[in-house]
Amino acid sequence: MNDFWQHCSALLERELTPQQYVTWIKPLAPVAFDASANTLSIAAPNRFKLDWVKSQFSGRITDLAREFWNTPIEVQFVLDPKAGMRSAPAGAAPAAPRAPLAPTGPAATVAAIAANLAANASAAPTAPADVPMTPSAAAAHHLNADDADIDLPSLPAHEAAAGRRTWRPGPGAAPAAGGEADSMYERSKLNPVLTFDNFVTGKANQLARAAAIQVADNPGISYNPLFLYGGVGLGKTHLIHAIGNQLLLDKAGARIRYIHAEQYVSDVVKAYQRKAFDDFKRYYHSLDLLLIDDIQFFSGKSRTQEEFFYAFEALVANKAQVIITSDTYPKEISGIDDRLISRFDSGLTVAIEPPELEMRVAILMRKAQSEGVNLSEDVAFFVAKHLRSNVRELEGALRKILAYSKFHGREISIELTKEALKDLLTVQNRQISVENIQKTVADFYNIKVADMYSKKRPANIARPRQIAMYLAKELTQKSLPEIGELFGGRDHTTVLHAVRKIADERSKDAQLNHELHVLEQTLKG
């Protein structure tokens, strides 16, 4: 029995992702084998794992048992809270002790950067105090404007009054390494909390994380620009901050800037108003790494787009890295100049999808641990099964549970969780699915639901299918590739064409607009 389980576990570990294996298979344990009845009993530590393993993995485990014993075997799954404690197969070598982990978190990140700066400071000669800085070096050194809401270099009062923009080092001696590390965070606008170490990885984001690590290791060389897109709360901002934090660790003094697209637009306007645009340009063109978040906010801002285009060209020409995020695929962003879209496409574009079940559980468990709370797996699975959209929603739900538990003086249980999330769970139960959209549209236009997946192209089928794709994009959080997959494995460009076509026709066709309104109200209940 134990030999079989060792064999079975090894095969499943190769077939599954690490997170799937650790979450579902590793906690299982064989507890009994009846050779006369050809039955094998496998224990799971809780009800959620038991139900999930039975529905997802029982067939594969049964097949492996039949192959191992060369006879049909009935695999039974039983509940045993102690299963996880004895899941290692008999005879297996004990795991080697892991080396202690280095401290993580913002304090550790700042400390590492400070040490890096101190090493560089001791090795490099100090520049004479009266040597003027070059414009590009000064632009990288100063980030604070005379007006607090625009990121341009500060000026001595007499120069500001004279309207001159002379660049020079800040007064006084160089700060200590720790102070310089803090100052670097202030200038770069990076959040030291957001690192690769505390980024939970799963199927939904593993490609994006791999690309981010590659860029952090080889900035300006691999994937320039890197364009990450996906819905809100899926970890795009976390990843780009992680890249910036990693580069600060690897390269003390790197010129890095994180900025939200809305702030960039605002700063462009203010730079023009204050006749400080040369300084603005000089600063952005001198960066080593530019992280710009939610670039869809550039939509319709032609002057901002023009200036960003020139900044982009200058940075890439200088082998500086550009990283961009958006809530949607680049070609789907309306109101963006074609020149910019082509530049976005010249690097690597990666989607971040909503987290799968195992990843949602891992996020909840890790977040609870960071709050000093020991969250049971039963509760984590319950929440993860009911809340599926994004990380922020999961973290918000966990905060509600913790607050409810503290206020009522009760331990966290599934019952308490249901009470704490009552309103949220009600909303989730009414959530619109692509499958429901397909059925509703098919009924409305009197076609078969199967026509939504078929390759048929008659107008009486193709048009309702395009309408269903449009509604799926408007009413769900699915990405274009996900929607395409749910419509018979179609390419995301087919979905994009349908969405744009129906959106354009809706603005011109009153009858179509009325039909869409009726469908939307039906779906929203």
UniProtKB/Swiss-Prot annotation:
Record keywords, A-Z: ATP-binding, Cytoplasm, DNA replication, DNA-binding, Lipid-binding, Nucleotide-binding
Residue sites binding ATP per the record: 233, 235-237
Region spans: Domain I, interacts with DnaA modulators: 1-71
Family annotation (Gene3D superfamilies): 1.10.1750.10, 1.10.8.60, 3.30.300.180, P-loop containing nucleotide triphosphate hydrolases
Subcellular locations according to the entry: Cytoplasm
Alphabetized Pfam families for the sequence: Bac_DnaA (PF00308), Bac_DnaA_C (PF08299), DnaA_N (PF11638)
Region feature (Domain III, AAA+ region): 189-405
Record protein name field: Chromosomal replication initiator protein DnaA
Gene expressing this chain: dnaA
